């Protein structure tokens, strides 16, 4: 028989903080240079033309333009920024 009843509950009750990952600027939306387009863990989606990648794999716009998602080489997803104006 157990002599300590409350031990199990102390091993539970913790939760990690939200990381707010995902697409921040949808395809077809207008972005300014430096705008974050996508936050991700690892390069699930690769940067294309006029899109840069940060050290935490964040993809951002290098120029003002319109966001475009497409399938690139080897069926890998890719995000580009098409310059406008």
UniProtKB/Swiss-Prot annotation:
Keywords, sorted A to Z: Ribonucleoprotein, Ribosomal protein
Single Gene Ontology MF annotation: structural constituent of ribosome
Superkingdom to which the source organism belongs: Bacteria
Gene3D superfamilies according to UniProt: 2.40.50.100
Region called Disordered, residue ranges: 1-21
One Gene Ontology cellular component annotation held by this UniProt entry: ribonucleoprotein complex
UniProt GO BP: translation
Disulfide bonds: none
A Pfam family that the UniProt record links to this protein: Ribosomal_L27
Family affiliation: Belongs to the bacterial ribosomal protein bL27 family.
Protein name: Large ribosomal subunit protein bL27
């Amino acid at each position: 028989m157990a002599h300590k009843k409350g031990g199990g509950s102390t091993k539970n009750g913790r939760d990690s903080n939200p990381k707010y990952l995902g697409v921040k600027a949808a395809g077809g939306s207008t972005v300014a240079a430096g705008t974050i387009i996508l936050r991700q863990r690892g390069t699930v989606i690769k940067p294309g033309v006029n899109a840069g990648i940060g050290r935490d794999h964040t993809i951002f716009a290098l120029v003002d333009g319109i966001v475009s998602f497409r399938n690139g080489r080897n069926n890998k997803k890719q995000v580009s920024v098409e310059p406008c104006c």
